[in-house]
Amino acid sequence: MVEKTIEIKQGQVLSDILPNKEIPTNTILNKTLTGCGATYGEIVHAKRHSIIIEPNVPVILGKKAEHPSLFAVYEGITKEDVKAFLAGEEDGFRKIITTPEGFDKKVLPAMYETHTPMYDDYFLLLDECEKTIQDVGYRGDIYLPVEDFFRFKNKAMVSATPILPSD
């Protein structure tokens, strides 16, 4: 694993300093600070289709309120809703935000059924990635996206408190 340190000055956000304003692919981003714009940059600046996985619905609802074009998947949103979004007119880059469970039960099946080449065409951002390990004991399905994570050509994990991989 190659480590690279990037300093953010007061008043800056990640998209101010990252190349092309995007989180690089195949990255574990240890941002050390919350609220420095990792998901904001992916939603607003990244010129690519994105699936953002958040561990909790309140975060998803907050992001949706800030960014109305973001397609939010949570309880009450169905696989058919996801398919309709994917079949709809595309005006720019598609941005989907979902829980781990929504990814597995709604987003993945909708992508398969619409023959959307998600592993090649979408960037997968696993936000608060430490929650996958911390919460799996009582929330077994939180781990499901990890099985698909490495199938994506373009992907990253983000956390202010990551649990780094070890041998």
Q: Locations of the language-model features?
A:
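Pre-Walker A (Motif I) flank of P-loop NTPase domains
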Residues: 22-30, 48-49, 94, 154
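Inter-Walker segment of RecA-like/P-loop motor cores
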Residues: 68-113
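Conserved H-loop
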Residues: 55, 127-130, 159-162
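Helicase motor interdomain insertion/brace
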Residues: 32-39, 140-143, 159
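SF2 helicase catalytic motif II
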Residues: 100-103, 111-156
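Conserved Walker A/P-loop ATP-binding site and its immediately adjacent core
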Residues: 34, 38-76, 100-102, 162-166
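Pre-Walker A adenine-sensing motif
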Residues: 1-24
